[in-house]
UniProtKB/Swiss-Prot annotation:
Gene source species: Aeromonas hydrophila subsp. hydrophila (strain ATCC 7966 / DSM 30187 / BCRC 13018 / CCUG 14551 / JCM 1027 / KCTC 2358 / NCIMB 9240 / NCTC 8049)
Lineage: Bacteria, Pseudomonadati, Pseudomonadota, Gammaproteobacteria, Aeromonadales
Enzyme class name: lyase
Gene3D superfamilies: S-ribosylhomocysteinase (LuxS) (3.30.1360.80)
Cofactor: how and how many bound: Binds 1 Fe cation per subunit.
Pfam families noted in UniProt: LuxS
Gene it is expressed from: luxS
Keyword Lipid biosynthesis: no
Cofactor: Fe cation
Binding site for Fe cation: 54, 58, 128
EC nos: 4.4.1.21
Protein name: S-ribosylhomocysteine lyase
Assembly and binders: Homodimer.
Function comment: Involved in the synthesis of autoinducer 2 (AI-2) which is secreted by bacteria and is used to communicate both the cell density and the metabolic potential of the environment. The regulation of gene expression in response to changes in cell density is called quorum sensing. Catalyzes the transformation of S-ribosylhomocysteine (RHC) to homocysteine (HC) and 4,5-dihydroxy-2,3-pentadione (DPD).
Length: 169
């Protein structure tokens, strides 16, 4: 099985919250697609709560689009990581980490403005696969955590696992 890009970086050295360019590629039409690792939690030390990450998934996707789309950028998708330490964001364009971090920070502030569970987008059995598994309170705690700690940058060249280490794992 091929080694995926996300497993070539040392998770023991990742900072959080932090933005990382996980991958950049070109489409046949020469559009740039960039995948960002938006790391909310320090891997293997912290984890996003199940209900909190689910609620955040519903809120974060819209708020990030509000703050990042435009000027050559269009978000394709924002999805939670299976390890529950962050989200992957795929987009058309190549914004720098500072622009993504500023949008992320603004989106977390927006999350805190949602004051009622009933205001969570798509919170119904028709549009959500587990619509009863939400917590606005936990999503607020995650947003506050990000805002209090600030958003840094993780760089692939600083986190790359050496080839010999990859072979031994």
């Amino acid at each position: 099985m091929p080694l995926l890009d996300s497993f070539t970086v040392d998770h023991t050295r990742m900072a959080a919250p932090a933005v990382r360019v996980a991958k950049t590629m070109q489409t046949p039409n020469k559009d740039t697609i960039t995948v960002f690792d938006l790391r909310f939690c320090v891997p293997n030390q912290e984890i996003l709560s199940e209900r909190g990450i689910h609620t955040l998934e519903h809120l974060f996707a819209g708020f990030m689009r509000d703050h990042l789309n435009g000027n050559g950028v269009e978000i394709i998708d924002i999805s939670p990581m299976g390890c529950r330490t962050g989200f992957y964001m795929s987009l058309i364009g190549a914004p720098d980490e500072a622009r993504v971090g500023a949008a992320w920070q603004a989106a977390m502030s927006d999350v805190l403005t949602v004051q009622e569970q009933g205001k969570i987008p798509e919170l119904n059995e028709y549009q959500c696969g587990t619509y009863s598994m939400h917590s606005l309170e936990e999503a607020h705690a995650i947003a506050r955590h990000v805002l209090e700690r600030g958003i840094g940058v993780n760089r692939n060249d600083e986190l790359a696992l050496p080839e010999e280490k990859l072979k031994s794992l």
